[in-house]
């Protein structure tokens, strides 16, 4: 199967705000019709940004559920040094993201992230540094670093069960 690597992923940037807003509603539609999702603590989210949402990363589908839970446009930070299968290549292209090389952090990643926070927007990050599937990895330090520099609170979030979210959805079972 064809994959897209660091050259493609490293060139991506977040899409315009209105586009991410539309995609948030697509996530709401998909999440509410194809999967059974329970959200707890949504009332604890800040009423307006900026803030950094830090979430575990057990599934390739986590960004969809992340968007579903927050229900506002999110600027994701995502690894550019990975391979993405053709089946999933549309997602980073359509949504866009702030690319980060997990082996060497570039100043442009920090600048883009701080720009998001200065505009009062939401920054989404998976501190694990990649999909870990069933174990929490030791978090990277970037979440706290960006929160401090951007003077934005960190909102913790957890997703579980996303890897099984689509089971039975084609049969009408949610």
Model features per residue range: what roles?
Residues 102, 109-110, 114-136, 144:
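Internal catalytic-core helix/loop-beta-alpha segment
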Residues 26-28, 94-100, 126-131:
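Short, basic, glycine/proline-bearing loop/turn elements
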Residues 2-41, 65, 86-95:
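A transmembrane-helix-recognition feature enriched in membrane-embedded lipid enzymes
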Residues 5-6, 135-174:
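A cross-family acyltransferase "interaction/gating" segment
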Residues 50-52, 120-126, 155:
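Residue-level preference for the first positions of well-ordered beta-strands
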Residues 66, 91, 115, 145-150:
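Hydrophobic/aromatic ligand-binding patch that stacks against planar heteroaromatic rings
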Residues 45-104, 112:
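Catalytic core of membrane glycerolipid acyltransferases/transacylases, capturing the structured
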């Amino acid at each position: 199967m064809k994959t897209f690597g660091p050259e493609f992923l490293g060139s991506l940037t977040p899409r315009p705000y209105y586009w991410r807003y539309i995609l948030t509603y697509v996530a709401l539609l998909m999440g509410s019709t194809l999967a059974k999702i329970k959200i707890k603590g949504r009332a604890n989210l800040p009423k307006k940004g900026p803030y950094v949402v830090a979430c575990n990363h057990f599934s390739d589908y986590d960004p969809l559920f992340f968007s579903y839970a927050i229900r506002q446009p999110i600027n994701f930070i995502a690894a550019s040094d990975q391979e993405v299968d053709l089946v999933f290549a549309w997602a980073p292209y359509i949504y866009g993201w702030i690319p980060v090389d997990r082996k060497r952090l570039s100043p442009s990643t920090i600048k883009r992230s701080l720009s998001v926070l200065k505009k009062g927007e939401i920054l989404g990050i998976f501190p694990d540094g990649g999909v870990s599937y069933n174990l929490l990895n030791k978090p990277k330090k970037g979440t706290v670093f960006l929160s401090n520099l951007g003077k934005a609170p960190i909102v913790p979030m957890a997703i579980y069960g996303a890897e099984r979210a689509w089971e039975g959805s084609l049969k009408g079972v949610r």
